[in-house]
């Protein structure tokens, strides 16, 4: 069994302050029309490196997606560009999921710049669910880094992750926005062990994951279905190496859709890892851009059927820059199509 690059990867320790010219810089581009109902979140602070220059989790990941989406004028015109929450709102949201020891550990062990980077990803996730839950947008995509679904409460980076963005967003949806049942769909190539761990005994959050069980962190099995009040609200579907669009879409139709029907979510979140795409440097699946488009349509149809279309997608993995950008572009197009199909 090969040792995966995510194992033992050490983050940089960066203590330098973030330049005011970088922090919070608004993305450029034409204003979105009033009809735009899909939110778009990115931030110049995602240019802060978390690892050495040769590391696959690099600032170029978000830049590649930004460039691909902004180059498509028709798609860019369908998006509402919004800004992340900051400061006390992020502090409060982190405290709902992460221990004080973990939060202090990230800042002390990895430095102020990396902590700012990770908090910006959280702030974008919070603003996205806020915009969908309260401000009238139907759905949103958050082009953020670093990823988050491996983060637990270890006080350090795990699998390139510092804070669990999707878990923090989930608790914000519940505790601040007042939605009770949240469905998390994780299609990253790697199992989201952090997300599973944080909600394993929580019946208000349904965690659905497809992944390669032989890859880092080797934690997900079909036998793990939740415990206590959360029994039955974790559903893991390991896929074999080389898994295709048809493989994952069959799982979605036969397992995800019926599970969502039973759970009846009030809000849907996606851990959108694009390292399952063919040609990824860390993955061994063969999903295509069309596969991601179809997967998005399935998840968006669940959101439309159960919760008025409310869906927020957060970037997780994806390390072949060209493939990442192309798959994310297909995903965002499908989100805008789903949003425009929803009645006002």
Predicted feature locations:
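HDAC/HDAC-like amidohydrolase catalytic core signature
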Residues: 4-15, 22-344
């Amino acid at each position: 069994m090969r040792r995966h690059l995510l194992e033992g990867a050490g983050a940089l320790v960066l203590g330098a302050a973030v330049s005011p010219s970088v922090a919070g810089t608004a993305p450029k581009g034409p204003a979105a029309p009033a009809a735009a109902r899909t939110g778009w979140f990115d931030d110049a602070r995602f240019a802060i490196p978390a690892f050495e220059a040769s590391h696959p989790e690099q600032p170029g990941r978000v830049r590649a997606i930004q460039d691909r989406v902004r180059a498509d004028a028709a798609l860019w015109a369908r998006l509402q560009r919004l800004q992340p929450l900051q400061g006390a709102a992020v502090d409060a949201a982190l405290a709902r999921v992460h221990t004080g020891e973990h939060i202090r550990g990230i800042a002390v062990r990895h430095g102020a710049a990396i902590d700012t980077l990770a908090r910006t990803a959280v702030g974008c996730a919070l603003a996205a669910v806020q915009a969908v839950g309260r401000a009238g947008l139907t759905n949103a995509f958050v082009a953020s880094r670093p990823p988050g679904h491996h983060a637990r409460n270890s006080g350090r980076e795990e699998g390139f992750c510092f804070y669990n963005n999707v878990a923090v967003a989930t608790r914000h949806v519940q505790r601040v926005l007042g939605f009770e049942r949240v469905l998390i769909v994780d299609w990253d190539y790697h199992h989201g062990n952090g997300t599973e761990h944080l909600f394993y005994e929580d019946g208000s959050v349904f965690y659905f994951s497809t992944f390669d069980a032989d890859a880092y962190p080797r934690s997900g099995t079909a036998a793990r279905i939740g415990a206590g009040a959360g029994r039955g609200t974790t559903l893991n579907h390991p896929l074999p190496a080389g898994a295709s669009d048809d493989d994952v879409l069959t799982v979605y139709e036969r397992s995800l859709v019926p599970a969502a029907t039973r759970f009846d979510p009030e809000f849907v979140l996606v851990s959108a890892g694009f390292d399952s795409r063919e040609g990824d440097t860390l993955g061994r699946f063969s999903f295509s851009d069309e596969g991601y488009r179809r997967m998005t349509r399935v998840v968006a149809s669940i959101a439309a059927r159960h919760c008025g279309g409310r869906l927020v997608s957060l970037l997780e993995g994806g390390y072949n820059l060209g493939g990442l950008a192309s798959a994310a572009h297909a995903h965002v197009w499908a989100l805008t199509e789903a949003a425009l199909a929803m009645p006002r």
